[in-house]
Amino acid sequence: MAGITIYEFDALTACPPSAPNASGLRAVPKPVFDWLEAQALAGGTAWLRLMQKGGRRAVQALGGYAGVIRAPDGYQIEVLPKIGRATSGDQADARARQLFIRMLCCLARFRHIQTESACLKAARMPLLEVFIGEFLRAAERVVKRGLRGDYVARRGNVFALRGKLQMAAHLRRNLCQRDRFFCEFDEFSSDRPENRLLHSALRRTLSWTAWPAHQQLARELCFVFAQIPQSAQPAQDFRRTRLDRSMAHYTSALAWARLILQNESPLTGAGGHDAPSLLFPMAEIFEACVARHLKRQLAPPFTLRVQAGSHSLVRHREQGWFRLKPDLLVQQSGENRLVLDTKWKLLDNARGNSEDKYGLSQADFYQLHAYGQTYLKGQGDMALIYPKTDAFRQALPVFEFQPPGLRLWVLPFYLEHQQLILPDCGSLDCSWSRSVPFQFSPKPAPVL
């Protein structure tokens, strides 16, 4: 199946296949470009905008989203995290794809991904095929454990007496058919919502996948579900699912089926079932990734709270307005000790001048100042956490707010090693014995 791999902020234009890329533009077939342009003009697509570049009409995949865009004709646009382009080394696409899979596993609703096998597949196949492969393996495990059935109430004119004879209906229908019985009975059947959903998801993946191994496995599984009808109303069937102890092995497969049938990624394109766009907000994924690993590596007695929202910026008529919600809050015995906020942006240690300011945002500093005044009462340490790249490999010198007392650190997070890189002294404050003891290496990570 035809497709292209791009990174966040890359621009796409319609070019003849033989025309070289110009001015950083990536070429896609004209029908695909026309569809993307129509999506941007229709509005409601947070991941796409119109632009002009090099004198050509183009559409830009906005930063902050990664995943797969699938055009109605099956053409796939794979959008990888921008950090993959900001690191050196061979096989950048494969490494970026593997890193994205590992990060995606940190989201609660995607923890069913088998990380190691998915990362191995990501080195040689597009993201959509990785997702399809994970679903097929999960469905295969369900089949090996056995499809669960349930008793379903039936009514019918049958040849043998079953269940309860419905006398009125029997006399009305069978006055001249002495060999029939109109009965109401319970029949054990595999036609239940969970199986209908899996069958529908299998049929859809069979139409999506271009990988021969996936096509073969999907056909084999569809044969197992052949006697079970597909789900006519997936949303209603998902509400009817019951995952009790005997259905625990269905959990992973149904989670993938929800993603496939309802396009239930955090962001879904406007293409509907014929053109699913499975895009994921990288800011949310990065926050979840940092939170998951810091929570494991914080030394006791410190604890980590995610999205704490106990303070407001102002009070008005006895109500708190403008809730202040730092991404992460480190506490000790209920006392706030450190405020952390994650940013999915790329910094550059070499741009440390008054004009470029490393690529930092003034708005982020205002935000952290408000957090420090409310959560730390104007005294203490805060940190902004950015992804580590070749250009941003070590913590920046501390930033001090005025009046003195509130300080801000800018730290890189090494995604491949799940490691927060602290300042050279090894803690956020070399002079404080009360400093939060993160158990991480203080030295810059090696170049990838």
Predicted regions: what they are:
Residues A2-A270, A275-P276:
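Residue(s) in the substrate-gating loop at a strand-loop-helix junction
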Residues M1-A40, A270-L448:
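Catalytic core segments in nucleotide and nucleic-acid processing enzymes
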